[in-house]
């Protein structure tokens, strides 16, 4: 039997997304992490389009990290994402959608790495 209760992570995700959509008209940088992989994508919610994405599943990352999600893998994903965002042009400012994840560990490491590359989050 499926429970009607909403889990803590789902409540956190809804709360974060509601604040982002209410306060911003900027593009949204959304992340997803699992035990083995880390994914990031830049989304325009107005037209429902993904402009750029990167993950630890890409060959450049797998060759270096041996399929483990750690700070080194996240730094490489941030580098890939910054290269793709620079190709888009004037995409330097966006909102950071951390989803149900707390802003610690590799989530904060990824955000700080993007800030180091000159993006405003």
From Swiss-Prot:
Quaternary structure and partners: Part of the 50S ribosomal subunit; part of the 5S rRNA/L5/L18/L25 subcomplex. Contacts the 5S and 23S rRNAs.
Protein name per its UniProtKB record: Large ribosomal subunit protein uL18
Superkingdom of this protein's organism: Bacteria
GO terms for MF: 5S rRNA binding; structural constituent of ribosome
Bilayer-spanning residue ranges: none
Keyword annotations from UniProtKB, A to Z: Ribonucleoprotein, Ribosomal protein, RNA-binding, rRNA-binding
Any one GO BP annotation for this protein: translation
Role according to the record: This is one of the proteins that bind and probably mediate the attachment of the 5S RNA into the large ribosomal subunit, where it forms part of the central protuberance.
Gene behind this protein: rplR
Disulphides: none
Alphabetical list of Pfam families matching this protein: Ribosomal_L18p (PF00861)
InterPro entries on file: Ribosomal_uL18_bac-type, Ribosomal_uL18_bac/euk
Keyword presence, Ribonucleoprotein: yes
Family per similarity comment: Belongs to the universal ribosomal protein uL18 family.
Gene3D superfamilies assigned: 3.30.420.100
SUPFAM superfamilies cross-referenced by the UniProt entry: Translational machinery components
Gene Ontology cellular component terms for the protein in this record: cytosolic large ribosomal subunit
Xref: NCBIfam families: L18_bact
Native source species: Ehrlichia canis (strain Jake)
